[in-house]
Structure formats: structure tokens, C-alpha cells
Amino acid sequence: MRQRFTARAVVVGDRAGTVVPDAVVDVRDGVIEWVGPSSEAPEQGDADVVALPGVLTPGLVNAHSHAPMVLFRGQGEGLPLDRWLQEVMWPREARLTPEDVEVAMTAASAEMLGNGITTSVEMYFHPERIAAAVGVTGARAVIATPLLPLPGMPPMEEQLRTAVALAIGAPDDGSVEYGLGPHAAYTVPLPVLRDAAAAAREHGLLLHLHVAETATEGDDLLAAHGLSVPSLLAAHDVLGGRVLAAHCVHMDDGDLDLWQEYDVAVAHCPASNAKLASGVIRLRDMLDRGIRVGLGTDGPASNDSLDLLADQRLAAGMARLRERSATALTAAEAFWLATGAAADAIGRPDLGVLEAGRRADLVHVDTRDLVFEPVGDLADLLAHLVWSADGRHVRDVWVGGAQVVRDGASTRVDAGALRADVAARAARLATG
């Protein structure tokens, strides 16, 4: 199937912030064939034409999420991370059923698609139910099966064996990919972390874990082992291969040197870090060292939205405040962190940028709104996309060339029915 998308402009999703005016994107069988100005476009031929009045962008890539936690949105308000987990989240999660997770993920996936997020890295229970949910909504997911020693869960060694078997047995079609998700060095025994990392390297899987999210985490592990969190992971052979570390807030120069040495990627979650008062990462230092970074929402219970367009604005603002410099993160870099950089961080070079050979995950942002005025040059469009727009301005979304959002609504699921179902399940989980 051939498709031709025409738009006011295309925002490519590269680090340079390339914007192509009066643009064409040609797609064949779900893969981009050509991108450029309409004046240089190849012959249209028999392509189905989709004419769009706004801006076309890559599908956003959410580098860290626990999306089924829409069941717990807003709960535990005002608590720091340790109390938030122990007093509010984990007791509710102990009552979760597989069906709860699938319904919640379906609702959350539809919400993310409506905000322009076409791919998310998920770490949550019942990974096969998460896969089933995105199969319904039409999204993509990289699912890091959680490894965590919680009551009622199998022994850690059994969890790891099951997670590896699930990952290596999954179809390689680009829609759902499984990885390994040992929660963190403060919750998972170090030998299990080491074994999970070895398995991930052996099979080419994503290893996804939380690192240095809070000062308390770092202080406790330093007291117990005499090492920072990154140094502890390096000492136990956890680094190397395809590692994606979420948060990475409390990192000194030596820690950043390790990340650079082992090519560890970072999932930066500014909204969650701000809400839970975890801290502000050294984003400029990471980028200047060549450390791969992608934006993540974290879970909707600690963000509390699933809107990367809003989070890119927060990431830019926090970086500028930290460095006291209005150039600490440019608009082009902020958008790149949610697109091309995020795809690179999660190890998916087939996503995140509008260029030939990548999958046709496309987002139409309606620019017929006051927040997109004035436009003196192409840089203004990108600046408005970062500093003024949010998920409300997403009108249409395609994943692999298939439309999954039309005029702001899912083409696959009934959002109203899902909302009611999530509300009922959340009430049950809150009361036991």
C-alpha cells in the first residue's frame, strides 16, 4: 500500500531541529520511502493522498513508563518516593489482577496515542497483558518484564527464567518487544541484577532499571557497599550491552564517566522527578558527554499525565534553570529528546525520525490555533511545538501507516467505556 502525506511542514525529529515547509512524506507498506518539500517530491502515482493542514511529526517515544498505573493516578499526593511506594502503591498493586492491568494499559495506551506517543517502554506486571492491550489500540511497546522480590511473586531466579523465555520467544515484527526490568539496585539482590544483565547481553535484550532516582537511594547503597549506585552496578557486571537507566538524578562526574564508558542510556522523567521532589538531572552534562538520553513520562501516578509534549517543555525549563542559561537546552534538542534521541536511547533505530527506511509512525499536530502564532520563520513552528503545544493539539496519529487516532479520538477503542471501567477497578483496589 502506498500513501502520500502532505502537510504545512514536517518536523523531522533530528537533533538539528530540521523543519521542512510545504512537505511530503511518502509511505509504502508502513515504512517511510521519501521525505522532503513538495516541489521535489517524486511522482504521486497510485498513492492514497492524506492532506493535512498542520505539522507532521514523528510518533513520540516514551522512554520510561508504568502506564497501567492510571489506576492510581493522583494517589499518595505529597509523599516522597519511599513512602509513596510503601504506603500507597505497593499495597494497591498487591491486589491487582491480570485483567486490571490489561484494561488499565488499554486505557493508558489510548491516552498516550491521543497525545502523540506511538511507542512506550513499559515496566509493569503481567507483561503479556500489556502486549495484548497495545495490540488492541495499535501502539508499539517495549516491555521490560519487572523483576522484583515482592510478596506473592515467584522466586527471583524463576522470574528471570520466565522473563527471558518470554523475550526470546516473541515475534520480531517491531510492534511488541520484551526486555528485562530488574527494578533497582535497592530492591533487587545484586546477584540477580548481574544474572539479568548477563542474560540481556546474551540475547540482545533491553535491560531497563531505575538508577539514582533519589538521594536516599544513593546514601543507603553508599553506606552498605561503599559505592555510588552506578559504581555498584559496574562492580557487579550489570553495565554493558543495551542498558536503559531511568531517572539518573543523583550522579557525580565519576558516575557520568561510567555511563559514557559503558554507553548507558538515560530515560529522563522531569515531571515525575519534580512531583516526587527527587531532584534535577545533569542533562546538559550528559548530552555534552555523548550520553544517550530520551524523555519518559514515568507512571501516571507520579507524573500524573502521559503527555510528552508537555514534558519536553518541563525538561527544557528545568535544564535552563539548573544551568542558569537560556541555551542549556534548545527547543530543537527538547523535541529531539522525545523523538529521535528517545528512539536511540531505547535501541530502536527504526523509530523516532521522519526519514526514509524508518517506520511510518506519524503525528499530525493541528497548528490552526493561537498558540502557533505568530510564525515568522520555520524555527518559530518548532519553538511553538515545544513551548506552547501539548497533547490537546494532536489531531491524528498513524502507526506503521495505519490510522489509530482520527480527529483526536481513538479509531480502535471506546475511551468512555474504558474510563468507567478504570474508575471502578481503581475504587476496588483503593479499598481492598
Role assignments for model-derived ranges:
Residues 1-23, 28-29, 338-432:
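Active-site microenvironment of metallo-dependent hydrolases
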Residues 235-242, 284-371:
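His/Asp/Glu-enriched, well-ordered alpha-helical/loop segment
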Residues 71-103, 137-152, 157, 164, ...:
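Active-site gating loops and adjacent loop-to-helix segments of metal-dependent hydrolytic enzymes
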Residues 8, 25, 30, 53, ...:
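Divalent metal-coordination and catalytic microenvironments
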Residues 55, 73-138, 161-172, 423-427, ...:
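Alpha-helical scaffold segments that flank or form the walls of functional sites
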Residues 129-249, 254:
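Metal-coordinating catalytic core of metallo-dependent amide/deamination hydrolases
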Residues 215-227, 255-260, 277-286, 303-320, ...:
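Histidine/acidic-residue-rich catalytic or RNA/ligand-binding cores of hydrolases
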